[in-house]
């Protein structure tokens, strides 16, 4: 292949590194209304009264909107970017009289500049009726205090939700008699694991600009992964026709799932629709920490049974998930905790997976890279590592005996066949990369420091089966260059480049001959959005099919112009050539074909293709960590992280490697330092990046990523996804390495130096 599987530079690389104006705040006017939100200081309260008189006297103030400006009995909406009908419940109003977490919206203020809005915000007088909050997600289900007591709460999908029980979702599934199988096992690991809420901490905070266009429509320019879903969300929130809303996306300064929720779009949209004036909201870092959409906190009870020979016979998993004050992504994230962990163990005779997602008076959770699989894999992989310890087996060996293989039906994966899998090769590759046999389990450095290794494996999906939709439009322009139109959102992942590579490979042209335009609801073909590891696999396949269709049209018009049948010609990317018949050898250039198509022609040199997949082939990953632990202080130094990934055919190895390295770094942070915590009143404790500790470059050591390619027949040129699976292995790998160093296994993240030092002290 000449373009696909080549390490080409991102199309927008130079513009980004040279600081060109490409982001929301760069490309939108400065002379617009500044929008800010007055937020609740209480975790659960009713606004008894609100007085904005003094605030509105501040020079420059345009408007202040409160719950009195919103129909409290109107239909609610969800901010979750999901295909309609969304699994997430309709539980929000633009401004609700009932505030449900510290940071919930009490009023929307709009003024000429930030200074006047800040001054006005201090003058708004609010009287609250403070209610008892639900802060412990263990006691939320069937708690007498209801987070959503309202009658207009609504669940559109059959996910087991019941607002009268504080249940956002409930599910049960399984196969075989799990209790009988576990009773017959030689060893049963029975443990409870806890993973914390974590922030995506993207560099660009949430932000949106809105204006009324020439036709009286609401034009939204937002940093979002989901332009089409945002159109529906805003229309639902404002109770206006979707035809009155247009959403576009400039470059995005990071998303990682956070911008799969319309966190910021609704508020300036409300202001602009009401005032008919342009407006903009830019979340501060504090707001992005206390009122965003972090990873769901989860607790997983795992029972894993095996024989003495190490064969895993059954897995029983119950997941309790904390969705916070609103249900965005709650019903769907929890499913991945089981359906993206249990299937790794293909020998299992039985499984059971049950889950509850509960409302609490914490910040609403949302989507974050890994989307529930991260949490479940920490639990299941940690249980397998403990099983290996008990049986005296090597963790690599026990996995080699149990993993799913190509051609097998995967347990707990909806009956899907494993159509492409190099997991066995990934295990062997990482085993050698980390020099496992010489380092496992640990080495005493005789200076108060111990070096140890640990490992874990992971899977994810490639889009959502029979739901995610990707589309592409390709057209030939004069001189024979192409325009590729997509609805997917490049949020730094490089899909504007990789999708163009797919098209260029089919059309046999240089990458520079394809101009990519993306993510505008008015002219982009429909795309569900950039999430669920779907862009390369789903939209990429649409692009491949679209390019093939356009190639056929080029040949058809070329044949017509050459006076022969389409079956007689070939196309090499530059010209159409007659291969047989009386005109054999005659050619016409693509440039001439393009020019001819614009004069007296009825063959359109444009194609649009939409694609959805009935399967979601998993990418796989194995990771191993080498750490050094200071037994006196508990400090963990990550020396080396070795990983092997099976993502099918990497479309762009450079971008694929960067995806993997970035995901591993985020997994390191979740394992060792990052956590969203609250005090006993529901106040978030980490409201800046000083308190919320993401790993810096010096904290992540050496990261090495290699690829073991399988070939996925349903993907473009054999490709599967890469974006999410890469965050999942550091959690079990590093935690297992810590156990091997200090002799104590940790079941709750993050594993801080304090916890490790105490464990080392207890061991002494």
Regions found by a protein language model. Give the residues of each.
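Glycine-rich loop/linker segments at domain edges
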Residues: 6, 12-15, 82-85, 161-208, ...
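Helix-loop-helix junctions that connect adjacent transmembrane helices in secondary transporters/permeases
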Residues: 147-238, 403-481, 623, 685-706
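Short acidic, glycine/serine/threonine-rich loops at helix termini
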Residues: 74-79, 120-123, 231-233, 256-262, ...
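Catalytic phosphate/nucleotide-handling subdomain of diverse soluble enzymes
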Residues: 462-524, 539
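C-terminal catalytic domains of large/alpha subunits in multi-subunit enzymes
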Residues: 67-68, 239-244, 274-279, 308, ...
């Amino acid at each position: 292949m000449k373009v696909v599987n080549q390490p080409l530079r991102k199309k927008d690389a130079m513009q980004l590194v040279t600081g060109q104006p490409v982001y929301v705040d760069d490309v939108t006017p400065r002379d617009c209304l500044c929008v800010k939100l007055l937020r609740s200081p209480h975790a659960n309260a009713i606004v008894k009264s609100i007085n904005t008189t003094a605030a509105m006297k501040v020079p420059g103030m345009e408007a202040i909107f409160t719950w009195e400006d919103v129909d409290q009995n109107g239909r609610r909406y969800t901010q979750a970017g999901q295909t309609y009908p969304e699994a997430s419940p309709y539980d929000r109003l633009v401004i609700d009289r009932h505030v449900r977490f510290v940071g919930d919206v009490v009023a929307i203020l709009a003024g000429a500049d930030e200074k006047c809005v800040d001054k006005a915000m201090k003058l708004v007088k609010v009287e609250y009726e403070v209610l008892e909050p639900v802060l412990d997600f263990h006691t939320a289900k069937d708690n007498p205090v209801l987070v959503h007591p309202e009658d207009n709460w609504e669940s559109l999908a059959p996910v087991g939700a019941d607002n009268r029980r504080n249940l956002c979702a409930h599910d049960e599934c399984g196969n075989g008699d799990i209790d009988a199988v576990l009773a017959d096992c030689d060893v049963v690991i029975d443990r409870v694991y806890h993973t914390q809420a974590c922030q995506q901490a993207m560099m660009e905070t949430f932000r949106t600009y809105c204006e009324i266009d020439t036709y009286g429509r609401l034009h939204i320019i937002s940093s979002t992964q989901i332009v089409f879903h945002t159109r529906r969300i805003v229309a639902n929130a404002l109770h206006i026709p979707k035809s009155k809303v247009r959403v576009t996306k400039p470059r995005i300064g990071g998303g990682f799932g956070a911008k799969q929720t319309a966190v910021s779009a609704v508020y300036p949209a409300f202001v602009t629709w009401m005032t008919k004036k342009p407006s903009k909201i830019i979340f501060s870092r504090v707001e992005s920490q206390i009122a965003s959409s972090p990873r769901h906190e989860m607790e997983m009870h795992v029972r894993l049974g095996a024989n003495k020979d190490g064969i895993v016979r059954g897995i029983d998993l119950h997941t309790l998930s904390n969705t916070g004050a609103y249900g965005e992504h709650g019903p769907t994230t929890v499913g991945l905790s089981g359906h993206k962990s249990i299937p790794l163990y293909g020998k299992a005779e039985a499984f059971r997976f049950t889950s509850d997602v509960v409302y609490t008076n914490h910040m609403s959770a949302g989507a974050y890279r890994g989307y529930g699989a991260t949490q479940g894999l920490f639990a299941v992989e940690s249980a397998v590592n403990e099983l290996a310890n008990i049986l005296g087996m090597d963790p690599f060996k026990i996995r080699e005996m149990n993993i799913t293989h190509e051609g097998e039906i995967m347990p707990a994966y909806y009956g899907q066949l494993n159509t492409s899998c190099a997991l066995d090769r990934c295990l062997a590759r990482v085993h050698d990369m980390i020099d496992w046999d010489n380092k496992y389990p640990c080495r005493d450095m005789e200076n108060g420091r111990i070096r140890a290794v640990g490992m874990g494996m992971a899977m994810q999906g490639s889009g959502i089966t029979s739901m995610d939709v990707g589309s592409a439009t390709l057209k030939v322009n004069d001189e024979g260059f192409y325009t590729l139109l997509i609805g997917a959102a490049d949020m730094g992942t490089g899909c504007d480049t990789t999708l163009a590579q797919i098209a260029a490979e089919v059309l046999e042209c240089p990458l520079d001959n394809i101009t990519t335009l993306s993510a505008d609801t008015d002219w982009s073909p429909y795309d569900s959005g950039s999430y669920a590891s779907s862009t390369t696999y789903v939209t990429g396949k649409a692009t491949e099919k679209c390019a093939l269709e356009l190639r056929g049209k080029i040949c058809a018009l070329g044949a017509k112009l050459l006076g022969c049948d389409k079956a007689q010609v070939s196309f090499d990317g530059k010209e159409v050539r007659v291969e047989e018949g009386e005109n054999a050898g005659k050619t016409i250039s693509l440039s001439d074909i393009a020019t001819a198509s614009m004069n007296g022609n009825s063959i359109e040199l444009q194609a649009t293709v939409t694609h959805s997949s009935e399967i979601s082939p998993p990418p796989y990953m194995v990771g191993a960590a080498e750490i050094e632990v200071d037994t006196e202080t508990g400090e963990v130094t990550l020396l080396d992280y070795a990983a092997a990934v099976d993502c099918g055919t990497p479309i762009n190895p450079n971008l694929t490697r960067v995806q993997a390295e970035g995901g591993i770094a985020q997994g390191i942070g979740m394992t060792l330092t990052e956590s969203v915590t609250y005090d006993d009143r529901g106040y978030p404790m980490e409201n800046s990046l000083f308190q919320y500790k993401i790993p810096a470059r010096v904290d992540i050591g050496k990261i090495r990523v290699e690829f073991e390619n399988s070939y996925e027949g349903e993907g473009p040129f054999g490709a599967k996804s890469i974006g999410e699976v890469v965050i999942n292995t550091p959690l079990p790998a590093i935690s297992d390495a810590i156990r091997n160093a200090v002799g104590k296994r940790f079941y709750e993240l993050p594993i801080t130096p304090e916890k490790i030092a105490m464990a080392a002290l207890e061991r002494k």
